[in-house]
């Protein structure tokens, strides 16, 4: 988080985790959440993320991602509801199911900027009612 927030002014920096950080930083608010699996995390992002931020946008930075060059930030990014890392063109779910994502290659939310409007809209989705081969946020 310290790498991703270097030279960037955020409205707030929050660490949502089931584990308390070993080192505390005055500008990072630790928010305790239950330990969860892949589906639990997807449910959190789809149904509950809006509970954790009050700003116009939220930058999600998972433990395997970080901001590389903060000087590339543009205020125009805030005009979009979602900016995220690309998926592979094909994702093998199981031996009999391959998702072809050539027409919609964006959706990898591990490093993504999401608007409050988008997050409040997805919160209306009943995660358990989703009928997809892969329930990824």
Give the location of each predicted region:
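Short, acidic, metal-binding catalytic loop of nucleotide-sugar glycosyltransferases
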Residues: 2-11, 25
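Short, conserved loop/helix-junction motifs that constitute active-site signature segments
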Residues: 7-8, 52-54, 74-78
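Short, hydrophobic beta-strand segments that form beta-sheet elements in well-ordered domains
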Residues: 9-18, 83
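Generic structural signal for small/hydrophobic residues in well-ordered secondary structure
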Residues: 13, 63-64, 115
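Active-site-proximal specificity loops/subdomain of glycosyltransferases
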Residues: 14-56
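Short beta-strand-to-loop acidic/aromatic patch adjacent to the donor-nucleotide binding site
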Residues: 55-68
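Conserved donor-nucleotide/metal-binding helix-loop-beta segment in metal-dependent transferases, i.e.
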Residues: 65-100, 104
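Catalytic core and acceptor-binding pocket of nucleotide-sugar-dependent glycosyltransferases
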Residues: 104-137
